[in-house]
Every structure is written in structure tokens, then in C-alpha cells.
């Protein structure tokens, strides 16, 4: 599934419900308590004003202030809320590979959401009359253009505000608010609303309810007529009585069902929640879809979990939270030394349970081998560093010191197989079968054990900087030689001819990327794959103007870097 863009959305939802069932709970009484308090205390004239604001095609700072003021009042009344709780996951909270996977997914989710919001909110389409909007839609259909993001009539709702950060966390439905609005504004009893929403929630246990399902339920639950038939879009408040808001409310008031909506995050269970989520993700082949648009179930869960380390990710008020998920949850791969316990002190919780804190990392013997290799490097002399594949999911790293004719070269198995295959096809040519036996943790240990404040030379430093920072190595200094591609690869063929035998992991076929412009000639395919080690040698050759005369020596033996292949007897 990681290679496919198709998402079996409901299957993923069911798998996440099953995998995270231990974190779900029954919250019906708490939701109804908040709903009754909101229904009795809120000025619904103010609610109606905010709902009118959200129907406008262009909203201003004054409109945003009305929404924020009402959100503050609702937040004050609710017991179910998320509070500002920033979390930094470190080694020990999660395994190193889990930390890198989390950091990578948050970075990709950030890119996707920012592209989605840019596409959806920054283009104001004007105030054409309805007749011209209809005519424009007809012209677009005639020309073969599919309807783009936005509303069916072509109007894009935008926020024209000075400080867009004030929009953060002011949206999203809350079941207590949905129930209160349906009760008061629909002129219904709360019991009728609860019964109707429960029917939607029960349907949600077997499928995603749609507008056709809603129409079939209305004869038995007339209060559902208040639900809008318009499609949801980004930056639409919880005061809009959408089908999604109603389904969420129905899911949260079920007695059971292991619904994700009932998860509560706390400092005590946050790391376990993330660990279990990543396990389900790998088992089901879930991924961050890089296409702008709605979030898939994994993306939605990850965003909500990481927004705050304390609260209700799906159903609580979150208007007091500052920042986005990638701001409030981060990763630090710096390895902290274990504190020496005082004599007679009680064992740590993990030790009481018989757990080995090193299981996800290298053994002490393996760590000593890496330390010995690093100690051979001379920080006062030039050291080249290069990586291959994504900066938060690298598959290859090399350190090369020309003066001492030595190098450190290691690999790791990627988490993002789809991204890896793309990189293999267009850049490094590494095949999964050639690195699937790489010993996990070596690459992170190499970075973590580099001497403090060491100066490293690179060709292109952005990706390397991000990788070092995520490992907590902001102390390491980078010098970027900033060659053009032609300058950097001047000695490419000679390096591969003379030193190509040093690395046997680049066996794929490199395919040139297609240019977006039809008029542009296709970009030339590199003659050779990108190898972190050979690229370091090649970059140094370009600087010095000649090839190294002697073959460099590996500081980490190959048998240390890979698990032995299983032998089968016939």
C-alpha cells in the first residue's frame, strides 16, 4: 500500500480503532454535561452571528474576533478541552527509528497541510453574480475541467486577516457544541438529538455515513433536518452543523465501539499512543499522502494527537492552544546518559517490568565499535559528509577524511518505502533487498557520537542540517562548497572506475525525471547513481583538482553494518 496513492480509508479507520482500543473510553455523560451547560449559558444570538459570518464569501479581522470571542466563552464552559502542552520525545520515550519516523511524518504532514491551505484560502475568486457563476461552471465543464476545491457554486470562502496565526485552532467541531446547537436552534429536546446522533454513530461503525444515508434517517429522526447538505471545507467552524460534525458527535456518545473520537491524551500515555499508532501504520501500510487535500485517517489522527500532549484530540475545545501539531510535538534524538541510581534506590519502572532500555538501540559492544571508529577521525582536518534519500528518512550516510584516508559508511532501512522507491529510481539506485538487513541504529549513533562543535564540509547542506538538528546536533558546523552540479560531478566517472568497488549497494536503474513543462527538454539522467561515500570522494576531488592516489580505509567493517543472511539447507 505504501507504493499506492489509493487509500482504503474506512479499513484504515477500523484498523486504528482496533489498534488503539485500549486508549478509547466511554464519554457520553461528560459530553452531555458540557452540552447542557452550553445550551443553558451561551447567547445563541451570538452563535447565529458567527454562523452568518461563516457563510460570507470573504471574512475580515472583525469576523475572526467574533469567532474567537465565542470560542473563548465555549471553552470556559467546557470540561472536555485540550490545553497547551508541548512535548519533546526523546530516546527512551520511543525507539530511535520510531522517533525518526514520527519526525519524518510530521514534516511531510506539515508540507501537505500548508499546500492544502494555500490552495484553498489564498485565492479570492470575486463576487460574480449567481448567473455568471453558473455560466462559468458550465464553461469549465465544457472545456473538461473538473470542479476544483471550494464550494459547488465556485465561490471560495477566504479569511482576509492581518495575522493568519490567529486562525489556528479556532475551527473543528465539538460534540457538546453540536448537540447544544441542534437542541436549541432546532427547537428539539436533547434526548431526541442524542437518539438521532446515536443512529448516525452506529452507522459509522460499519461505514462512512453520507448524505444519502442522512436522507434515509430523517423520517425516523426529524431533528437531523437541521444538518447542512454542503460539503465541509477547511477553516469552517464547529458552529456549522455539517454531516461530519454530526457523525463525530454520534461516534463520541456510543457506549463502546472503540471510537477514535473518545481518545484522551495525557503525559502518561502519549508515548504509548504514538508507539501503537506507528505499529498500526506499518502493519496496514499507511502513509502521508503528499497530494494537497483532505487528510486520510492516519494523517488526521497524527495531527490531532500531536497538537497537544494533554486533552481530547477529537472532541475537546482546543481554542486556547497556540501553534500547530509540528510546533507542539517535536523529536530530540540526543542520547541522554542514564543517571546512576543511589545505593538502595528503587529500580526505575522499566527495570521493574524487566524491560531492557537498550532493546531499540545498539548493544554496549556495538556502541563501543562506533565510538572507536569516530575516535579515529581528526576534527582539525577536513571531513566530508553526505547522505542519500530524505533528510528525515536517510538510507545512507558517509563521512570521509582525505588526510587520514579513512571513511565511515553506513546504511539504514527506510520507513517511507514509497519515498525510498522514488529516490532509488531517480537518484541513488539503492534497492530495498540490499539494505533490508542493515543493523538499525548505526546511522543515528554515528551522528550522536561525533565530536562536539566539529566542522563538516558538504556539497549542499540543507538536508544535512535538518538531519543533524533532529538528532540534537545543532553544535556541528557545516561548510557548504556550493558547487554547481557540473562542477561537483567533474570526476564522477573516474571516481566510479577507481573506487566503485567500495560500495555495492547501488544496483538499481536510474531514470530521468520528467519536467513539468512540456516545452522543456527532459532533465538529463545522471550517468551514475548517487552514492554518499563516492560522492564525498568526488566532491573532494573537485576541490583538490585530482583523484585520491590511495584507496581509503573503512573504519566500520561491513559485517558490523549488516545482519548475516540466513542460509537455507537443501
Curated annotation (Swiss-Prot):
Positions of Zn(2+) binding: 396, 503, 506, 531
One Pfam family here: Arena_ncap_C
Annotated region described as Disordered, given as residue ranges: 332-356
Residue sites binding Mg(2+) per the record: 386, 388, 535
Subunit structure: Homomultimerizes to form the nucleocapsid. Binds to viral genomic RNA. Interacts with glycoprotein G2. Interacts with protein Z; this interaction probably directs the encapsidated genome to budding sites. Interacts with protein L; this interaction does not interfere with Z-L interaction. Interacts with host IKBKE (via Protein kinase domain); the interaction inhibits IKBKE kinase activity.
Keyword terms: Capsid protein, Helical capsid protein, Host cytoplasm, Host-virus interaction, Hydrolase, Inhibition of host IKBKE by virus, Inhibition of host innate immune response by virus, Inhibition of host RLR pathway by virus, Interferon antiviral system evasion, Manganese, Metal-binding, Ribonucleoprotein, RNA-binding, Viral immunoevasion, Viral nucleoprotein, Virion, Zinc
Record region (Binding site for the cap structure m7GTP): 54-236
Family: Belongs to the arenaviridae nucleocapsid protein family.
Higher taxonomy: Viruses, Riboviria, Orthornavirae, Negarnaviricota, Polyploviricotina
Organism in which the protein naturally occurs: Tacaribe virus (strain Franze-Fernandez) (TCRV)
GO cellular component: helical viral capsid; host cell cytoplasm; ribonucleoprotein complex; viral nucleocapsid
Biological process, per Gene Ontology: negative stranded viral RNA replication; RNA-templated viral transcription; symbiont-mediated suppression of host cytoplasmic pattern recognition receptor signaling pathway via inhibition of IKBKE activity
Protein name, as recorded: Nucleoprotein
Site keyed Important for exonuclease activity: positions: 463
EC assignment: 3.1.13.-
Function: Encapsidates the genome, protecting it from nucleases. The encapsidated genomic RNA is termed the nucleocapsid (NC). Serves as template for viral transcription and replication. The increased presence of protein N in host cell does not seem to trigger the switch from transcription to replication as observed in other negative strain RNA viruses.
GO molecular function, one term: metal ion binding
UniProt KW Cytoplasm keyword: no
InterPro entries reported for this sequence: Nucleocapsid_arenaviridae (IPR000229), Nucleocapsid_C_arenaviridae (IPR035084), Nucleocapsid_C_sf (IPR038115), Nucleocapsid_N_arenaviridae (IPR035083)
Record remark on domains: The N-terminal region is important for the cap-binding activity while the C-terminal region contains the 3'-5' exoribonuclease activity. A CCHE zinc binding site is present in the C-terminal region and may thus contribute to the substrate binding and/or the specificity of the exonuclease activity.
Origin superkingdom: Viruses
Subcellular location: Virion; Host cytoplasm
Binding annotation for Mn(2+): 386, 388, 535
Amino acid at each position: 500500500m505504501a507504493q499506492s496513492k489509493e487509500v482504503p480509508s474506512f479499513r484504515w479507520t477500523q484498523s486504528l480503532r482496533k489498534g488503539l482500543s485500549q486508549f478509547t473510553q466511554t464519554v457520553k455523560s461528560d459530553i452531555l454535561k458540557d452540552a447542557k451547560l452550553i445550551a443553558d449559558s451561551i447567547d445563541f444570538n451570538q452563535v447565529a452571528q458567527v454562523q452568518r459570518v461563516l457563510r460570507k464569501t470573504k471574512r475580515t479581522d472583525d469576523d475572526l474576533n467574533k469567532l474567537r470571542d465565542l470560542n473563548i466563552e465555549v471553552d470556559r464552559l467546557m470540561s472536555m478541552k485540550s490545553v497547551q502542552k508541548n512535548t519533546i520525545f526523546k530516546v527512551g520515550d520511543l525507539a530511535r527509528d520510531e522517533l525518526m519516523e514520527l519526525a519524518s511524518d510530521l514534516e511531510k504532514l506539515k508540507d501537505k497541510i500548508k499546500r492544502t491551505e494555500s490552495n484553498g484560502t489564498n485565492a479570492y475568486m470575486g463576487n460574480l453574480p449567481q448567473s455568471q457563476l453558473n455560466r462559468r461552471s458550465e464553461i469549465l465543464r465544457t472545456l473538461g475541467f473538473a470542479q476544483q476545491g471550494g464550494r459547488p457554486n465556485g465561490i471560495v470562502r477566504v479569511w482576509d486577516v492581518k495575522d493568519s496565526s490567529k486562525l489556528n485552532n479556532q475551527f473543528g467541531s465539538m460534540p457538546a457544541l453540536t448537540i447544544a446547537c441542534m437542541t436549541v436552534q432546532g427547537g428539539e429536546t436533547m434526548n431526541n438529538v442524542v437518539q438521532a446522533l446515536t443512529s448516525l454513530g452506529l452507522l459509522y461503525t460499519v461505514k462512512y455515513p453520507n448524505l444519502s444515508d442522512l436522507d434515509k434517517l430523517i423520517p425516523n429522526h426529524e431533528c437531523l433536518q437541521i444538518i447542512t447538505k454542503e460539503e465541509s471545507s477547511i477553516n469552517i467552524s464547529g458552529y456549522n452543523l455539517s454531516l461530519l460534525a454530526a457523525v463525530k458527535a454520534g461516534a463520541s456518545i456510543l457506549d463502546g465501539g472503540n471510537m477514535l473520537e473518545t481518545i484522551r491524551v495525557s503525559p502518561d500515555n502519549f508515548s504509548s499512543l504514538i508507539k501503537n499508532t506507528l505499529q498500526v501504520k506499518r502493519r496496514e501500510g499507511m502513509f502521508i499522502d503528499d497530494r494537497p487535500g483532505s487528510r486520510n485517517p492516519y494523517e488526521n489522527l497524527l495531527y490531532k494527537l500531536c497538537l497537544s500532549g494533554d486533552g481530547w484530540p477529537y472532541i475537546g475545545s482546543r481554542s486556547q492552544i497556540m501553534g500547530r501539531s509540528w510546533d507542539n510535538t517535536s523529536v530530540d534524538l540526543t542520547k541522554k546518559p542514564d543517571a546512576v541510581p543511589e545505593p538502595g534506590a528503587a529500580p526505575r519502572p522499566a527495570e521493574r517490568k524487566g524491560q531492557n532500555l537498550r532493546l531499540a538501540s545498539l548493544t554496549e559492544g556495538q556502541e563501543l565499535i562506533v565510538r572507536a571508529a569516530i575516535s579515529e577521525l581528526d576534527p582539525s582536518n577536513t571531513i566530508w559528509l553526505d547522505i542519500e534519500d530524505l533528510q528525515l528518512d536517510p538510507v545512507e550516510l558517509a563521512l570521509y577524511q582525505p588526510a587520514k584516508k579513512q571513511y565511515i559508511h553506513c546504511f539504514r532501512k527506510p520507513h517511507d518505502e514509497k519515498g525510498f522507491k522514488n529516490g532509488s529510481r531517480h537518484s541513488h539506485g539503492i534497492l530495498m533487498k540490499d539494505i533490508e538487513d542493515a543493523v538499525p541504529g548505526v546511522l543515528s549513533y554515528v551522528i550522536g557520537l561525533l565530536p562536539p562543535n566539529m566542522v563538516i564540509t558538504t556539497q549542499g547542506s540543507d538536508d544535512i542540517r535538518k538531519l543533524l538538528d533532529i538528532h540534537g546536533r545543532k553544535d556541528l558546523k557545516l561548510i557548504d562548497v556550493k558547487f554547481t552540479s557540473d562542477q561537483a560531478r567533474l570526476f564522477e566517472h573516474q571516481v566510479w572506475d577507481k573506487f566503485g568497488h567500495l560500495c555495492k549497494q547501488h544496483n538499481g536503474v536510474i531514470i530521468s525525471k520528467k519536467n513539468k513543462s512540456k516545452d522543456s527538454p527532459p532533465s538529463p539522467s545522471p550517468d551514475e547513481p548517487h552514492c554518499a561515500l563516492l560522492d564525498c570522494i568526488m566532491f573532494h576531488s573537485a576541490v583538490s583538482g585530482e583523484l585520491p592516489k590511495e584507496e581509503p580505509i573503512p573504519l566500520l567493517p561491513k559485517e558490523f553494518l549488516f545482519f548475516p543472511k540466513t542460509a537455507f539447507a537443501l
